[in-house]
């Protein structure tokens, strides 16, 4: 991917919906890229005041908080919107942005709540797909980990097995752990083997803080293992044809530095922050 500079996006106006959690990481990357963060959406005036004060203190950014997306769009006139809100309101925010012809960068899952049915999912996906102003990126940025290290991977064109392990200090339990973390492994798997709509021989094992599944993806034997608990340290490892790798992250001067450790070769490869790579691609798409 071609590298960017801060002047490339300096006149581009982006609004971020949701600040806590992943929203803060989006602001960190957008600030590094020189983007004009023209507004944020929060759930209340109190949380908005807290967010704008913290953003000013940590990133030196002066922005305005809104509690209404309509007001945010009308007043701040964003050229793109990053959706980092709770899953339950993704769909309504996406359509509202599309109605104003604003492209969307949406956090995963695209749409989800515990009571949603397959029929409702299909209906909402169809509404997104058929919208005349549909321009949307889903944050499956971990695919870029594979794309950036492909030249170092052994037998990448003849993958027989793929294992993915992800531990986080997230809040989800039981099957909801998979709804949160499954897209990370799937994005990497699709980067390796291309897309497929079928999983064969699917089996799963679920505990309160653990989710494990195995399945066949095309000709690849796949295993996913996820753990979530407030006391866990974040850890991501993956194994391709029994060769194990680990994603390493370090924050330095408000910049997320990412590398991949190859256990067999005893080497560490520096890569671009996957979220930054995906956001750059999205901004150029806009």
What residues fall within each predicted segment?
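Rossmann-like dinucleotide-binding domain that binds NAD(P)(H)
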Residues: 167-233
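Receiver (REC) domain switch-region micro-motif
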Residues: 40, 81, 162
